[in-house]
Amino acid sequence: MLFSISFFDVVVNIISGIAMIIFIIASMIKSKNKILSWQCIGHMIFVFVETMTKAWSSIVQEVIGITRNLLTITKKNTKVISILLIILGAVIGVAVNIIFKPKDAPWFGSWVGYLPVVANLEYSIIVLRKNSTVRTIKLSFCISSILWGLNFLFLGVYVSAILNFICAITALISFFKFKNNMNIEEEEVKEN
């Protein structure tokens, strides 16, 4: 229930807070594979949290995210696999959102349940592109974090909602800092 606080809510918020700290760390890393590795750990923790909160559409997206990142890290993703993962995430996410509508959470099955689907869809497209850069991933991660933050707000996982919004800001700052560092390096190369 929105804005209810119980022992269960406290436990869920603590565990999700740990996962979000991992995602914040990932947003500050400059190596693509390290970003994706840290995110895999965060996704695994969130599968546990979302199982506890019965956020089935979110769980589908976490599993797709783990799969996507591992395939990207191990360089085993192909265009066919990439497209299949994107389609599976969207189709299964939408289906699960329609099928599972808990009575105690009337906003599920509505637009809120689609937030994780859209977040994962846009992020998957960016990460799986062969020419994606660290900057592009950071910006996509910012957008994804905003969508996940809204989702967690409605799940009652307030720590993750707040930290997702902080993570979005951190990724955006890192995005601009990384650009500025690239410009400085380019100027230094031109001067030499």
PLM region spans:
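Alpha-helical membrane-protein topology signature
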Residues: 1-192
